[in-house]
Curated annotation (Swiss-Prot):
Segments on the Cytoplasmic face: 1-11, 58-76
Species assigned in the record: Bos taurus
Role noted for this protein: Component of the serine palmitoyltransferase multisubunit enzyme (SPT) that catalyzes the initial and rate-limiting step in sphingolipid biosynthesis by condensing L-serine and activated acyl-CoA (most commonly palmitoyl-CoA) to form long-chain bases. The SPT complex is composed of SPTLC1, SPTLC2 or SPTLC3 and SPTSSA or SPTSSB. Within this complex, the heterodimer consisting of SPTLC1 and SPTLC2/SPTLC3 forms the catalytic core. Within the SPT complex, SPTSSB stimulates the catalytic activity and plays a role in substrate specificity.
Keywords, comma-separated and alphabetical: Endoplasmic reticulum, Lipid metabolism, Membrane, Sphingolipid metabolism, Transmembrane, Transmembrane helix
Domain of life according to the entry: Eukaryota
Lumenal side: 30-36
BP GO annotations: ceramide biosynthetic process; endoplasmic reticulum organization; sphingolipid biosynthetic process; sphingosine biosynthetic process
Subcellular location: Endoplasmic reticulum membrane
Family: Belongs to the SPTSS family. SPTSSB subfamily.
Gene Ontology molecular function: any one: serine C-palmitoyltransferase activity
Protein name per the record: Serine palmitoyltransferase small subunit B
Amino acid sequence: MDFKRVKDYLSWLYYQYQIISCCAVLEPWEQSMFNTIILTIFAMVVYTAYVFIPIHIRLAWEFFSKMCGYHSTISN
């Protein structure tokens, strides 16, 4: 894939984002505030998923393994 096609594709994605989120009709300072809020929410969701999903997967694994009768020698 050449650089121009990638650049055009990313520009198209950004345009789609602006149209879907109605950012195209906002003033520049409103766009920056909106994008900052969206980026902050996205970062918080990613961080929360990174921190808490492995814990929940481990707890679910322990629950179902005990329920099915499999006892691991690794867990205490």
